[in-house]
């Protein structure tokens, strides 16, 4: 059965309840519960560890399938060619859905030819602006400030980019996980659906959820720390180097080649900017105004 909405251009077929979908239709994605799995044997294809990443996770590959282990979250089995994602049974449904729309979904939309980047995306006047940077670069706090200013959040941390025929962002899950101190200061709109030791988990509804249609990409902003709010255009060759470091790719030759060609298309077609700003709440209004301005620069 269809779950009644889309995420990253996929329309899930599942009996599970999914709360972060956006209205629309898309490509079929099978999602079901995984009864149990035998842990893969051998070295992981890739591993993520704190503090550079919020969770400890390992990704394995066996023939056409991937197996993702997440600490305190169980196993996910992903078959991108189908596409199909099997999620763990008996775990917290909120955490499970949040993790479903991370690496498992990424593996499926990469198979489709889309490009993943480590960045948030916000819609401003009908166009998307990508906010890129490593963990702890202030992406989520800036995204929360833009949300509070009335701009729709397309995705909070993992962006799905379609490079051709013209670059566009496919909206991800309608959610935002905000640090507790940022939530208290900014009070962004959204229904609180969960809390943990570090974050408030918000679900976006109404106009701030919007639909799942692709949004034309107008600008990519590389977030930098500075004493002043300022920006400058980045030459395509320099932007390619920075975006390569922020791209989410596997240590496989075909995946690296796919990623490189997608980023070349992106840097040739979309303005890339360095956005320098102080990481203070007092400067956020000026930063929000600068983001909106850069989204309108041809």
Question: What is each of the regions a protein language model found here?
Answer:
Residues 1-24, 120, 124-134, 148-298:
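Glycine-rich, often acidic-flanked micro-motifs
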Residues 139:
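Conserved lysine of the Walker
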């Amino acid at each position: 059965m269809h779950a009644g909405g889309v995420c990253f251009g996929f329309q899930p077929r599942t009996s599970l309840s999914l709360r972060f979908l956006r209205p629309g239709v898309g490509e079929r994605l099978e999602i079901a519960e995984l009864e149990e799995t035998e842990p893969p044997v051998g070295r992981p294809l890739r591993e993520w560890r704190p503090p550079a990443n919020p969770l400890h996770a390992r990704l394995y590959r066996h023939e056409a399938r991937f197996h993702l282990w997440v600490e305190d979250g169980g196993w996910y089995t992903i078959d991108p060619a189908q596409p199909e994602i099997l999620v763990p049974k008996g775990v917290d449904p909120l955490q499970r859905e949040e993790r479903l729309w991370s690496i498992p979904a990424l593996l499926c939309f990469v198979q489709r030819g889309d490009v993943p980047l480590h960045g948030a995306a916000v819609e401003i006047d009908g166009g998307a602006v990508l906010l890129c940077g490593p963990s702890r670069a202030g992406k989520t706090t800036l995204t929360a400030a833009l949300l509070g200013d009335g701009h729709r959040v397309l995705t909070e941390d993992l962006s799905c980019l379609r490079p051709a025929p013209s670059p566009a962002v496919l909206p991800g899950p309608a959610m935002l996980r905000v640090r507790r101190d940022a939530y208290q200061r900014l009070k962004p709109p959204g229904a609180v659906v969960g809390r943990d030791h570090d974050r408030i988990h918000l679900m976006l509804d109404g106009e701030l959820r919007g639909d799942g249609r692709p949004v034309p990409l107008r600008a990519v902003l590389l977030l930098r720390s500075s004493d002043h709010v300022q920006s400058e255009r980045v030459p395509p060759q320099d932007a390619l180097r920075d975006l390569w470091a922020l791209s989410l790719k596997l240590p496989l030759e075909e995946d690296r080649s796919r990623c490189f060609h997608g980023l070349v298309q992106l840097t040739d077609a979309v303005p890339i900017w360095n956005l320098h700003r102080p990481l203070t709440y007092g400067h956020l209004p000026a930063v929000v105004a600068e983001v909106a301005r850069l989204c309108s620069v041809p």
